[in-house]
A protein has these predicted regions:
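Recognition helix of helix-turn-helix/homeodomain-like DNA-binding domains
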Residues: 26-43
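Short, charged recognition helix plus adjacent turn
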Residues: 34, 54, 61-77
Length: 77
C-alpha cells in the first residue's frame, strides 16, 4: 500500500473528509486534496505523510522487519 492509499483508507475508516483534513492541518482544501489525490508524483514525501497521518491520529514509524505489526497498523511499501 502506498502512503496515499494508506491516507485514503484511514480517511474512509474514520470518516474524515478532505475539508476535515484541511482544517486539522491548517491548510487549504485544495492543498489537502492534492496531498490525498495528486497524480503529479508517484507518492508523497515521508515528512508530509507523517504530518498528515498525525492529523488523523496516526504516526509514521520504522520498526525492525521481524517485529510484530499491530492489527490497526498499515504497512507502506
Amino acid at each position: 500500500m502506498t502512503g496515499r492509499e494508506t491516507m485514503k483508507t484511514i480517511m474512509e475508516a474514520k470518516d474524515i473528509s478532505n475539508a476535515d483534513l484541511a482544517h486539522s492541518l491548517g491548510i487549504s482544501l485544495a492543498a489537502a486534496w492534492d496531498r490525498v489525490n495528486s497524480v503529479k508524483l508517484k507518492d508523497i514525501s515521508s515528512s508530509i505523510l507523517a504530518q498528515t497521518l498525525g492529523a488523523m491520529g496516526y504516526k509514521l514509524v520504522a520498526i525492525p522487519v521481524e517485529a510484530d505489526i499491530p492489527k490497526s497498523a498499515f504497512i507502506i511499501d
